[in-house]
């Protein structure tokens, strides 16, 4: 049920819509100036490609088969000791 006592200020709504469309809201320019868009795009691209700062360094040092064997041995030792 609509509240008929409050009227919409059409001029204010138009102003807000215009600010939103242009990306210049109340905080738009303050925070946007601190964001390096090119750097963010580069980081997003690296993340999507799986090549983050540490992506290849750690992946190349991990032998999944060896880890599985170590986990299996640890589980067997734990069962024998309990």
From Swiss-Prot:
Q: Where is the composition biased (Low complexity)?
A: 69-82
User: Keyword Cell membrane on this protein?
Assistant: no
**Coiled coil located at which positions?**
none
**Compositionally skewed regions (Polar residues) per UniProt:** 1-24, 32-50
**Keyword Transmembrane helix in record:** no
Its GO biological process annotations read: sporulation resulting in formation of a cellular spore
Which Pfam families does the entry mention? Answer: SASP_gamma
Kindly give the InterPro entries that the UniProt entry links to this protein. Answer: Spore_gamma (IPR006341)
| Similarity-based family | Belongs to the gamma-type SASP family.
More details: SASP are degraded in the first minutes of spore germination and provide amino acids for both new protein synthesis and metabolism.
Q: This protein is called what?
A: Small, acid-soluble spore protein gamma-type
This chain's source organism reads Bacillus subtilis
